UniProtKB/Swiss-Prot annotation:
Residues 1-41 form a transit peptide. It holds the Pfam family Ribosomal_L27. This is Large ribosomal subunit protein bL27m. GO terms for biological process: translation. GO terms for cellular component: mitochondrial large ribosomal subunit. Component of the large subunit of mitochondrial ribosome.
Amino acid sequence: MLRLSGVKSAVRARAAAGAAFSVSLSGPQAVSLLALPLVRHATKRAGGGKTNLKDSIGRRLGVKATEGTYVQPSDIIYRQRGTKFYPGENTWIGRDHTIYAKEPGYVRFYYDPFHPTRRFVGVGLTPEARLPTDHMAPRARRFGRNVISDPKRAEAELAWRPNKEQQLLEEISERRAVKQAEEQALTDKLAAKLKELGFDNSELAARAQKMAHYRTLGWTNAEAARFADAFLNTSSDVKDFDAKFEVTKFGTVVPKSSPETVEKELNETRDKLTKVRQPNAFISLSQIAKIDKILDATVYLSQSQKEQLADEFKVTASLLEAVQPHEEVVKAAKKGKGKLVKVYNVQRKGIDYVLAPKDAHFSEDIAFQKEFVH
């Protein structure tokens, strides 16, 4: 264990002299410390000793900037111990209770009607400013700008932008130009379709373009029409527009839906789905994708009708209906005609075998599937 001999008194003596010091420790091994310069950081205030003659030097407290004096930011206005004065407008207080300026201006000593027992020190931004400002008055602000009388210089100042902001503005303008070109192309396409349906009106084309935008967001045709009218603030041929055609979620114009058009599309969709798959015990992922694609391409069918068709054509029958003799199933599986699926038959409490297509999709990817027959 190392033992320190007179280190405390030596450190105090060297610290009082304000010089670097070095200390040697005596013990089993000699340990030398590097010369360390003492740097003293003032925090709040220097503490006084208790055994002196009470005649130490003063701390130079009091007013440093009188009423009406012009000060710069961080200039000390008042040094104190405790809060004889409180920081007011455009001033702040330090950890040693020193009040200093935060803005360039003129010193004002004042009372605040909301705090009648406190004395405040603030900074007025102009020589005519008096504190405190009215409670409901707008806050005085200094922008650090002067009026430019030269028109050319004023125009150049208005056009000036930082480099980062200028690059960002260029990118935004490019994206805006591309978007405007796409919107114009869509408007022309919709105008051509409207002309085929007997409507030759540029305002209707612009309205249809706005409706197409809202429809891509998932809104209904009625919601898209209402918001498009509010955006364009027009009512020309609105009734005729709503009565003859509507805009789909794909951004195309189609005739107005009716029970006949819905029934016709329902029958056509059912015929397409029948060609893709007949209800049986197996279904593949490719068949599921084709069914979803056909249903998504519909225009007039409601969501409930789409769900009903999906349930009808995606359902799989019980695997027990596809059970074949064990020898034939195993022989076909070995020849690569399909994959072997084991099915548990609850009635006879045994295992049956089913030959499923190679691309068959099961709800659960398991080698052993249980089927419960009631």
